[in-house]
Amino acid sequence: AQYAGEFGPDALAIRHALQFPPEVVRRETTSGRWNDETVTAYLRRWAREAPDAIAAEAPGYPPLMFAQALDKSERFAAALAVRGIRRGDVVMVQLPSGPDFLIAYYAAARLGAVLSTLHMPYGPVEAEPLLRHARARAVICGPATEKLDLPAMYKALQAGLPKLDHVISVGPARHGVLSFADLVASGDCAALSGEPRADDPVLMCYTSGTSAAPKAVPHSTQSMLANPRACAPIYKLAPGDRVLSAPPFSHAFGIYIANLTLMSGATLICVPAFTPPSLAELLEQSRPTHAFLAPAHVAAMLHAGLLEGRDLSGLRLMIISGSYTAPGLKAAIEVELPNGKAIELWGMTETFAVLMGDPDEPAELRHGFIGRATPGSETRIADSEGRVLPAGEEGELEVRGCSVFAGYFDNEAANAGTFTADGWLRTGDLAVMNARGHVRMTGRLKDIINRGGVKFNPFDVEALIDRHPAVLQCAIVPMPDRVLGERACCFATVRPGKSLTLADVTGWLAQHQVAKLKWPERLETIDAMPLTPTRKIIKGELMKLLTARSS
């Protein structure tokens, strides 16, 4: 009722999903972790204090200065306002990481709209249900290419999406598609009224959907900014620093990096598209002081020898996150960083970064664990009955803190069981914590295989098979069995020129003294793993493939 006059019905529904428990609001506001600072406030600060400093740059784009970023984003926000986009409305963006994406993001934040993201590989099958579920009022996309005509795709979808009023493209205006550049140029800031509020929804990302359909995760400005603000001192970021973000801005991790860089007054180096050679070259040529990468980025460059002989002397800190980090990866990349260290970050779309390595800790801690709870976050390990476990015992990681979301939008089934009775988020990840709070991931609850009543976690077995000389990537999934209930099937992609048999796999595991009950009893080789846009293996797709091949 408090917001009924300020939000439309659909926007009000998203606002309703952001109802944090009163004790959470009290805890975070009293601590000062939640305050009134907004994305717009940070952008205005640096536009005022360092107008000609570079806010963002990307290959193929002119540099974007802080003053330009503020001016263009406010003009674009005004153009959206004139076209009926109001506070709480969803604006969906399908753009590569770069200045255009940031202008759209800053504009939505200034307007009080909710930014929702679509990954670049998405076509109509993936985009349509998310646009419908989000009740998107506008979508901003790239130009037509030989591979996919995004503006035409969205115009075709618009006929079946009555909420979708506007299709905006960074390409030329055509067929009822508005031009992003024209809107930025014509926007009149006099059309803007009011200021964004820090407790309003500002971002709604969809989970990667490794085992189920994507779920919508709304965040307020407070829950979105509290975490990078608390973590900034650990990174030792300052104006003049240069931050490379390989994770795409369509992912919550990419937005986290963009916010961290903005509030620090540093320069954001964007990566519009990833190939191992181009990323290796950008790491050298752009001279970052900090680089955020996914494990797949690092592993691909190391495997191909693409970093050998490159001058990475200016890189002080490499932060690895986004999926499972193989043992030895952080130590291996540090060999290429004469003046830098590698740490790991762990989080979820629902939480942002809640575990983080400390660059000032010894290598054995940085390399052997993800890290400890970030400032403003708490972690614990619980068993299947919800009992909190002592140090050293494996159980489910549970978290709470300043950046944990309030619940999924329009998905009561997903919300059921997400939080414990005392308000901790159940992550679904298995982990072990030592006496000092350092956490090491050991698997996913959903990946547990129940072989005749004996349950085992395939996580460590997968990590070992990944080290086989013939294996590029592997994943173990359960397969139905009439006698035992479940057995284990290993899917693997094989290195060029190599071959792999089940006997090779089991022999490798025997050589490394893995208990036979954990050995896979079937091997399926495939050309490529089904991956989310953030390069996580979609085990649900592998199980469908297994069913199809079995039948």
Predicted region positions:
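AMP-binding/adenylate-forming catalytic core of the ANL superfamily
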Residues: Y122-R132, V139-C141, A291, G401, ...
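Conserved AMP-binding/adenylate-forming core of the ANL superfamily
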Residues: N35, R44, D52-Y106, G123-E128, ...
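Conserved pre-ATP/AMP-binding loop-to-beta segment of ANL
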Residues: D36, P51-D52, S169, H175, ...
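Conserved ATP/PPi-binding loop(s) of AMP-dependent carboxylate-activating enzymes
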Residues: R372-G376, R387-T418, F456
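Gly/Ser/Thr-rich phosphate-binding loop
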Residues: M263, P288-L293, L302-L365, E378
